Amino acid sequence: EPSARPTSYIIYKAEGQGGFDNGTIVNTTRCQMQLEPGKLYHFKVAAVNAGGESFTTETLSVLYNPAASKSVLIVNNFHRLASPQVVDDEEKQGFDLNQDPGVSYGLTAGWSGKQQVFDRSRMGNETSFGLGFSGNEMIGKFVAGNDFNYVQAHATSIAASGKYNISSCSSEVIASGRVQMKNYQAVDLINGLERHDGYTHAFFKSFTPALQNSIRQYASQGGRILISGSYTGSDMQTEEEQAFLSDILKLSYEPTGSTAITRDINPEDSTVTERDSIVCTSPNVKGLGLQFSYYNELNAQHYAATHPEILKPVGNYAFTAMQYDTGTSAAVAYKSTTYRSFVMGFPLECIIDERTRTSVLLGILKFLTD
């Protein structure tokens, strides 16, 4: 609420895998504290006034490693909170959980089931054929949403290598220029489920124009960047946005369900037969010498990447670095003499197995920085 001005702040701190402390009260927006070298710290902040305490901010992490020669900046760009996909036209109305289940603040048990009837003409019909009728498959089930702690998950994996210093920030300070990516040997951008859905009151976007400009500038300065998230391609549909994807990230977006031509070769006479096939993704991925799965269906443990994307390499020096089980491209890597990038079609933090997630992240950083 804009008129709710804070009079003080509470800084909560956690060390390593430990829980957060009871907080330290500060009266200004600046604070200095002594941190031990070699120890990973996590912070979140709440605002306070006579009316009480706010929700806390996203969790940010920091590590000073005296033996490290390289520094990684983790940038959180996953701030979205949203209802399921709104359907509202002359013929249909409702919430389509299959199209987009939305993003709750943390856990929610708010759904009885997926809406099955969207026909406006059935409004007022209180039977299973009436507008808004839903299933009951989700009764009593919790669904994980945005916990705002994914910087912590990435930082924990990076710290396991013992090779890097770690800093972190919100994407807003990157877009505003307050934090310069050029000061870091690699940037890890967390996009999560960030996208402009067209119906949420707040504006969310995978790459705002300001963030695009910051990434362009970082690339021109020889930057090394990892980007992971669910809507890298589908949220960038204007001519200028698609130029950013192809010119800077060296990729193009292929919609799931589109038709591609598959060429079958007869091993006996080498004749080629062409046929149409439907391109699709899978919750199983192979890449970097590993095979793994990510959260693809709604569950109580972690938010799900229900709409991963197919990202195809564009131009010289770009190549497919991960594949879904269906054979389609799950990630695009680019390595030239000027800059490097690695873009995934699903959120890295959604990889289910923690050890595998750490191996994937460290493998990508090795590609970017070695």
Segments and roles (model prediction):
Residues 5-38, 51:
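Recognizes extended acidic, P/S/T-rich segments that occur
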Residues 37, 48-69:
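Extracellular fibronectin type III
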Residues 41-45:
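Hydrophobic/tyrosine-rich beta-strand signature of extracellular beta-sandwich/beta-rich modules
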Residues 67-148, 219, 236-237, 243-258, ...:
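Extracellular ligand-binding/catalytic regions of CAZymes and related secreted enzymes
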Residues 75-79, 169-172, 189-194, 221, ...:
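Active-site-proximal beta-strand/loop segments in catalytic clefts of secreted hydrolases
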Residues 113-244:
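Helical hinge/lid and interdomain linker segments adjacent to catalytic or ligand-binding clefts
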Residues 193-300, 360:
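A glycine-rich, often tryptophan-bearing local segment used as a flexible ligand/cofactor-contacting loop or short
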Residues 260-353:
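Catalytic beta-strand/loop cores that center a nucleophilic Ser/Cys/Thr
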